[in-house]
Amino acid sequence: MIPFLGVLFDGFAYGMLLFLLSVGLSVTLGMMNFVNLAHCSFAMIGAYVTITATQTLGIPFLATLPLAFLAAAIVSVVLERVLFQRFYRATDLDQCLLTIGIVFVSIAVVAYLYGTTLQSIKVPAYLQGSFNVGGVTMGIYRLFLIAIALDVAVALVVGIEKTRFGARIRAAVDNQRMARGLGIDVDRTFALTFALGSGLAGLGGALAIQMVGLDNDFAFRYLIYVLIVVSVGGLGSIGGSFAAAVLLGVSDVAGKYYAPQFGAFFIYAVMIVLLMWRPQGLFGRR
């Protein structure tokens, strides 16, 4: 029983990381109907900003987290203004080709600037180590990541469902012409939404370094996981992304722990079963 609880805790922590990496794509894809396969490139931007800030500039780890968010958000706004907004009415294939091209560019830039070796980071002493609760070993850093992910989930639900900005997003998505007629700056709203989603990816990338490491293939490797979470959770659903991330994170960790020879396939098996049951996702609309 104790090993199972430990696996459950580690799986939940991994699920929270997947949630941070994927929820921004769920928002932009579900609400703006834009297929952004470059989403994990923004996560990689946040991660390498954290690496540079801590190792080169000597900035404390916690102080780099908002920097990672801002860096990814700023780059995304520039790309949204210059490139992405021109493709909002394009076909899904055109959007995929554009954004996957950006992934290749980001990988090449990172390889040129940082090389292809695995990067690591040293977190503060107070985030290292672990402690036992009822015989279950809990890593302090994992608890820290879980706390941040839960705060982000609550803030997103409240922000999108209960605030004026959230109402503007929903109005702009439902009917752009009507929203413009009501005085809503749709272009600005979309840019801010894109910045929010990409900034969260940057934050997730910064937090991912300690758990899963970082190299120039990060944007491709975790794009698959992010797309799985968004598909299983349902487009545009924050609650769906949260539930899917937890379920898939626990499944992935448990599969690799109990059946390491087949562990890498568990997350795909769970995805197939869930999408056969609910093709629109757990919280998606038909």
List the predicted regions and their residue ranges.
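Inter-helical junctions in multi-pass inner-membrane proteins, predominant
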Residues: 2-17, 159-164, 190-232, 252-264
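Single transmembrane alpha-helix segments in multi-pass membrane proteins
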Residues: 3-55, 78, 82-94, 230-238
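Helix-loop-helix "hairpin" substructures at the membrane interface of multi-pass membrane proteins
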Residues: 14, 137-214, 238-244
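Hydrophobic alpha-helical transmembrane segments of polytopic membrane proteins
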Residues: 20, 72, 225-250, 269-275
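Short, non-helical or kinked segments that cap or interrupt transmembrane helices
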Residues: 25-47, 61, 89-95, 165-168, ...
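Alpha-helical transmembrane segments within multi-pass membrane transporters and channels
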Residues: 58-103, 109, 243-248, 278-279
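Cytosolic-side transmembrane-helix boundaries in multi-pass membrane proteins
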Residues: 82, 113, 174-181, 185-188, ...
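Transmembrane helix-bundle core of multi-pass membrane transporters
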Residues: 86-87, 91-162, 189, 254, ...
